[in-house]
């Protein structure tokens, strides 16, 4: 990567190309090296300009963004940030893009949005620095989905699992949760996502994982065999009620620039569950969740961080590790099984 993050903006709308370019040019560490209005123009521009990162509209005429993304990942793997409408259809397409290999997704702004595209410039810089392209290029295209541990081989103890993730988290969560049996420990997750995206993601996880996965609702009781995903962009997820633990959705300002925030979730788990918890921090940029994971460890919880080699962005796990919050760092493929080891009931009774 050069000193500046060099980005190509691809969108069929001249207005949207101009807006994205203006947002990116406002950051002195980002250089917009070109624009393209369709896949053919984009392919030529990538060959000519060799950008570090591409922003790509999902909904384009002729060859759409998903089709073009597949070609990029097959022929020239590189970090691509998808730009999508904040609709259910847009969310489904964004999730498909992330599974194909997109670095991240951002939503198109609503009229009057004070911060159009949010932290897009930061995402572009993180993408340019990341190992994402190299990781994608070396991953087998036909890798089989992880198989869940059979229910007969796992007996849940009394522990609750809390997981936090951001950039790269969609693929990481799929890899972890597909190892879980249908009788997995109650699991609460905060993944940084735009509004509407988490509902689609929960539905997707529910189809491909053995446990029940749902978007968290206020007051939902934590149950064995259920996974609860914080709704994107609206409220923070906590756990509450020591005698009958449940989800609590909290109206509060963003924490660490995020709502929902991983720190808010981890803080509540540290206070409520103490040593009867496992905290996991996965790939993501920034530091959200690091301080909360440290609180969990100090409260007696077991803690796991994703290692640098398998992270799309080694940000949140790095800060957590440097703070002393991470008991053990593991490659992504080992984390699901490790969570199950840490939460299984002891032979003499639930721990």
From Swiss-Prot:
GO biological process per UniProt: chemotaxis
Signal peptide (from-to): none
SUPFAM superfamilies: CheY-like (SSF52172), Methylesterase CheB, C-terminal domain (SSF52738)
All residue ranges annotated as the CheB-type methylesterase domain in the record: 154-346
Residue stretches making up the Response regulatory domain: 6-123
Compartments (UniProt record): Cytoplasm
PTM comment: Phosphorylated by CheA. Phosphorylation of the N-terminal regulatory domain activates the methylesterase activity.
Record-annotated active site: 166, 192, 288
A Pfam family per the record: Response_reg
Enzyme Commission code(s) on record: 3.1.1.61, 3.5.1.44
Gene3D superfamilies, per database record: 3.40.50.2300, Methylesterase CheB, C-terminal domain (3.40.50.180)
EC top class, as a word: hydrolase
Residues bearing the modification 4-aspartylphosphate: 57
Coiled-coil boundaries: none
Catalysed reactions, semicolon-separated: [protein]-L-glutamate 5-O-methyl ester + H2O = L-glutamyl-[protein] + methanol + H(+); L-glutaminyl-[protein] + H2O = L-glutamyl-[protein] + NH4(+)
Any single Gene Ontology cellular-component annotation: cytoplasm
This protein's UniProt keywords: Chemotaxis, Cytoplasm, Hydrolase, Phosphoprotein
Main subcellular location of this protein, as a coarse class: cytoplasm
InterPro entries: CheB-like (IPR008248), CheB_C (IPR035909), CheY-like_superfamily (IPR011006), Sig_transdc_resp-reg_Me-estase (IPR000673), Sig_transdc_resp-reg_receiver (IPR001789)
HAMAP family: CheB_chemtxs
NCBIfam families per the UniProt record, alphabetical: PRK00742.1, PRK12555.1
Written domain comment of the UniProt record: Contains a C-terminal catalytic domain, and an N-terminal region which modulates catalytic activity.
Function recorded in the entry: Involved in chemotaxis. Part of a chemotaxis signal transduction system that modulates chemotaxis in response to various stimuli. Catalyzes the demethylation of specific methylglutamate residues introduced into the chemoreceptors (methyl-accepting chemotaxis proteins or MCP) by CheR. Also mediates the irreversible deamidation of specific glutamine residues to glutamic acid.
Family classification: Belongs to the CheB family.
Protein name, per record: Protein-glutamate methylesterase/protein-glutamine glutaminase
Lineage start: Bacteria, Pseudomonadati, Pseudomonadota, Alphaproteobacteria, Hyphomicrobiales
């Amino acid at each position: 990567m050069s000193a500046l993050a060099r980005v190509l903006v691809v969108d069929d709308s001249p207005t949207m190309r101009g807006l994205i370019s203006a947002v990116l040019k406002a950051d002195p560490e980002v250089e917009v090296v070109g624009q393209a209005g369709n896949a053919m123009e984009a392919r030529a521009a990538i060959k000519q300009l060799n950008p570090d990162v591409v922003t790509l509209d999902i909904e384009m005429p002729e060859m759409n963004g998903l089709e073009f993304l597949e070609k990029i990942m097959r022929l020239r793997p590189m970090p691509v940030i998808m730009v999508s409408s904040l609709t259910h259809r847009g969310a489904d397409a964004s999730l498909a893009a992330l599974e194909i290999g997109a670095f991240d997704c951002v939503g198109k702004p609503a009229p009057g949005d004070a911060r159009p595209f949010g932290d897009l410039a930061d995402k572009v810089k993180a993408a340019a620095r990341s190992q994402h392209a190299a990781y994608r290029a070396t991953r087998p295209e036909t890798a089989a989905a992880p198989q869940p541990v059979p229910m007969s081989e796992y007996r849940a103890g009394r522990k609750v699992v809390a997981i936090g993730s951001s950039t790269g988290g969609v693929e990481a969560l799929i890899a972890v949760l597909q190892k879980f049996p249908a009788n997995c420990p109650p699991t609460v997750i905060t993944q940084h996502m735009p509004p509407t995206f988490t509902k689609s993601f929960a539905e997707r996880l529910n189809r491909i994982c053995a446990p029940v996965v749902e978007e968290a609702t206020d007051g939902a009781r934590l149950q064995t065999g259920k996974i609860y995903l914080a709704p994107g962009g609206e409220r923070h997820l906590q756990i509450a009620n020591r005698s009958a633990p449940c989800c609590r959705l909290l109206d509060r300002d963003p924490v660490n620039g995020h709502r929902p925030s991983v720190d808010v979730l981890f803080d509540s788990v540290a206070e409520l569950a103490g040593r009867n918890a496992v905290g996991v921090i996965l790939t993501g940029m920034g530091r959200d969740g690091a301080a909360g994971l440290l609180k969990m460890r100090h409260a007696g919880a077991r803690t796991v961080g994703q290692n640098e080699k398998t992270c799309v962005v080694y940000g949140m796990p790095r800060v957590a590790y440097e703070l002393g919050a991470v008991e053990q760092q593991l490659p992504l493929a080992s984390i699901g099984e490790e969570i199950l080891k840490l939460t299984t009931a002891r032979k003499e009774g639930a721990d």
